[in-house]
Amino acid sequence: MRRVVFNHKGGVGKSTIACNLAAVSAAGGARVLVVDLDPQGNSTQYLVGKAGRELDPTLAGFFDQVLGFPLKPKKPDEFVHGTRFDRLDVLPSHPALAEQQGKLEARYKIFKLREALVELDRQYDFIYIDPPPSLNFFTRSALIAAESCLIPFDCDNFSRRALYGLLEDIDEIRTDHNAGLMVEGVVVNQFLPRARLPQKMVQDLIDEGLPVLQPYLASSVKVRESHESAKPLIYSHPKHKLTQQYVALYAALETKRQNAVRESGRSLDLSLRPFLKAVSTRPQPDALTPAQALPVEGGETQWTQHKP
């Protein structure tokens, strides 16, 4: 499963969501790769800390190879690096990506990332792609390479306005390049349950037919602490409420995905245009119960093991 976490508005928690879902996947037994397409390298730093600046080769090296004709080209897995977390790898970013964009667009290399990640599918159960917060070559490459898309949503008017334009961009990619791309849902981030505006905004999205995922992710200072320690929440704060929400979100996504494959023999198509009136009339499968999904006494976590 190749899953892109996409929003062309910055500050909505895109990298945080991608890395924490990836970490929960890995902690649950899956083999996971995070692909950091953002020249800022936030996901790379989150997973490997300051050592991320020294990693070589990186995605910039991969795209250099795409632009050139090396005598002995590296295979995609040669650009991958391990992290200190079991079963969790990273294909790291580099600031040079920003300088490569124009050349890659001019030579129409937009399918090269997809080709590389399809080759890596054999080694991983999940590939999480973190593109830049803008609609550019790297973002389009990510949407073409992905099988599914998660959309982070921060509860403010700017995010809501951007959301509908974003769905149009996804639909254009589906029409022109990647007909199989599905929208798994909207991930509500930094949610304040006691504030009226966030509640109203989320309810409006639901009323308009958008697939809003549950649980909503709470706002917490623990996110910044986990950034500082370069340890996703499942490793840095395993018992925290927000960590439990990430576990439940991952479980809900997995349940939905596995049920869809079981029922139809193929991936569930949740693609939609803005203001789509109906995605599905069936109730979504429940997430794991607290006894299955949440940390228990003694710091251990009970899991439903991932089965590739």
PLM region descriptions:
Residues 1-308:
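P-loop NTP-binding core
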